[in-house]
């Protein structure tokens, strides 16, 4: 009897989702058209207000919450989040769908409008189509179908759209967690529809350690570099040491966890940006850049480490490398500023939500 009921529900949900495919595309397009670039953190309120209208129509009680005082929050770029909750007929556990609303910078080389949401050959193109406005749209459509198929469900359903995931989440999930919105008493199960292979369940993530490294020199006239000390050349030695020593060592470290994609099994580090010398001229000006010897050069690093590694060891490895350069390079001075740290996490593969999703993947896609 229970098996027949499940099969009937599966058929009903499949049909309801099928007839909503066009709505899924349109919702994804609408979300893409709201340019929530982070940094700096644009249009968070606009996307929250859009989601508020959508969720309110299907009976969700919503809250739009500003993460006031968090990193990046300002009157110009306030960090807004939305949480919607819908209670079932009877009490029970809560399933929460969380998606971040921010997207990274656009970059170069686009052949489509990055905020146009254009459909081409069966795909939606735009910044955030994959990461992760498509996932946000999918969770809303799935919940809409579920509510129609199971109007008398038990427990509660929540959907959130949160800010700043791309820059650490302090103005989003972290703030809401500190305020108790994800407490075990309120939420028992969480699904985050981040982009991955559709037949895979991601149970955890690597740790992250972000830092700024600054090397120092002495400013001087460009015609007399011997009178100064070039901070960019000092940074060049740091980058060379990364290439010669650090990156090869990271390549050797491989997790025992079943991680995909393959490259994520290793420890990694990205050099996000580099800035050296004087202020760049106004792009609209025809002036030539400064000819001074630079007295400062800064890089931002993003070190992703394995669950088998310790964040303090990760930090010490960078500092030891810099101290090694200092011991052999005259006038080498540096400063390390920690910007962010995220500890690796792992969900038990026997958790009810994991087993339920695994069963659904097998049912829909025929894959275990």
Residue ranges and their predicted role:
Residues 60-65, 90-92, 250-283, 287, ...:
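An extended, acidic, His-containing surface patch that forms the Zn2+-binding/catalytic region
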Residues 2-124, 148-153:
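Acidic/His- and Gly-rich active-site-bordering loop/insert found
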Residues 203, 222-293, 307-334:
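Acidic-enriched catalytic cores of C-N bond-cleaving enzymes acting on peptides and small amides
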Residues 86, 215, 303-305:
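Hydrophobic beta-strand positions in extracellular immunoglobulin-like domains
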Residues 132-206, 210:
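Acidic/histidine-rich catalytic neighborhood of metal-dependent amide-processing enzymes
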Residues 120-132, 366-368:
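Short pre-catalytic strand/loop immediately N-terminal to key active-site residues, enriched for Gly-Thr
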Residues 20, 107-109, 151, 202-208, ...:
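Short glycine/proline-enriched loop/turn "hinge" motifs that connect secondary-structure elements
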Residues 16, 26-30, 34, 50, ...:
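Generic non-transmembrane alpha-helical segments
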């Amino acid at each position: 009897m229970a098996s027949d009921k499940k099969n009937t529900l599966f058929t009903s949900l499949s049909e309801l989702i099928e007839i909503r495919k066009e709505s899924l595309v349109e919702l994804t397009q609408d979300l893409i058209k709201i340019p929530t670039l982070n940094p700096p953190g644009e249009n968070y309120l606009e996307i929250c207000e859009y989601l508020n209208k959508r969720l309110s129509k299907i009976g969700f009680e919503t809250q739009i919450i500003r993460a006031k005082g968090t990193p990046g929050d300002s009157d110009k770029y306030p960090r807004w989040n939305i949480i919607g909750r819908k209670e079932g007929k009877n009490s029970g556990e809560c399933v929460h769908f969380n998606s971040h609303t921010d997207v990274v910078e656009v970059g170069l080389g686009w052949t489509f409008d990055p905020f146009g949401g254009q459909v081409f050959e069966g795909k939606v193109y735009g910044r955030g189509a994959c990461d992760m406005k498509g996932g946000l749209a999918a969770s809303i459509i799935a919940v809409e179908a579920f509510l129609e198929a199971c109007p008398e469900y038990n427990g509660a359903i929540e959907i959130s759209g949160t800010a700043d995931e791309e820059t650490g989440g302090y103005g989003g999930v972290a703030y809401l967690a500190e305020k108790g919105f994800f407490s075990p008493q309120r939420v028992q199960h969480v699904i985050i529809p981040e982009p991955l292979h559709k037949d895979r369940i991601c149970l955890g993530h690597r740790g992250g350690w972000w830092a700024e490294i600054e090397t120092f020199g002495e400013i001087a006239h460009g015609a007399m570099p011997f009178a100064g000390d070039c901070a960019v050349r000092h940074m060049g030695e740091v980058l060379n040491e990364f290439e010669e020593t650090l990156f090869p060592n990271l390549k050797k470290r491989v997790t025992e966890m079943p991680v995909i994609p393959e490259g994520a099994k290793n420890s990694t580090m990205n050099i996000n940006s580099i800035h050296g010398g004087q202020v760049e001229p106004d792009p609209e000006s025809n002036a030539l850049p400064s000819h001074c010897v630079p007295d400062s050069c800064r890089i931002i690093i993003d070190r992703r480490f394995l669950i088998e590694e310790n964040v303090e060891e990760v930090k010490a490895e960078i500092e030891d490398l810099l101290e090694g350069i200092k011991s052999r390079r005259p006038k080498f001075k540096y400063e390390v500023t920690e910007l962010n740290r995220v500890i690796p996490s792992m969900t038990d593969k026997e958790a009810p939500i994991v087993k339920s999703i695994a069963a659904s993947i097998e049912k829909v896609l025929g894959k275990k």
